Amino acid sequence: KDLKISILSNLISLKDEQIPVLKEVNLSLIQTSLYSMNPEIHDKITTVKGSFEKTKAAIEKLVAADIPVQISCPLMKANKDGYADVLKYAQKLKIKAQTDYIMMAQANLDTSNLANRLSLEETEKVLRDIFEYDLEYQAITLNLKPKDEERKFDKERFLKEPVCGVGYDNCCITANGDVYPCAGWQEYVLGNVYKQSLKEIWENSERVKYLRKITNASFPKCADCEAFNYCNRCLVRSFNESNGNIFALPKHFCDVAFLNMRLAKEYEEKIMKTMYQS
């Protein structure tokens, strides 16, 4: 009751006999990563030969069983040109696909994987494709208002609001029972369900209590930034990339926020111009 359960899985080990069970438990969502519609690119990223065909087949079986599925397509240098095809595939199946074009550092604070992160120039090309093909992203982004408009009415309330849902409305549980705040934050263990109840962890973990104290006021620079609404601020991104410093503001995140704002304005002007010419 009052609990939504989602599963994050590559689905390569999904068995046919498990599908009725997944349907019976009434999952909120199964999310899986599909990095490209090119099998070679997908398998190169996963380092598992044949994983593309297995994941794709599993997605289609789940869709056929009317189990909610969402495709995640994190972008990096190896698959930066393939999101549009993944999105079209998802649209064909009538399911949602989303991308993350800012690669996150590893949960163990190792940043060596960021060599594969998209440059600002590559991110711009990807964002232009997203504005063109991803209707949901387009609708959400084009309806954003400058944050100043919202803040001037009740800035005090805004500053007291949490940065995200971490510690408030979501957590993750691994197969070994470890509980952590959100996907990508595996090293920040809150407790273990084999040693204590989830209720006890959620209500009494000192780490959860600490996360709940973090609000928009903890980031004064962000609170006054004109690109605030176009920024995907994320505690775990900062934590992983900045040697465990939740309050760090890596420059790349800020650059992408301003890029997103600029492209949104350009695209909006393009739409308005087309409407006037019609």
Regions found by a protein language model. Give the residues of each.
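Conserved Radical SAM active-site core
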Residues: K1-L8, I12-S28
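Short, conserved alpha-helical segments within structured domains
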Residues: L14, A78-G82, S218
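Glycine/Thr-rich phosphate-binding loops of Rossmann-like dinucleotide-binding domains
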Residues: K15, E40, L235
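Radical SAM enzyme [4Fe-4S]-AdoMet core and its adjacent flexible, acidic
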Residues: P20-L29, S33-N176, G184-V193
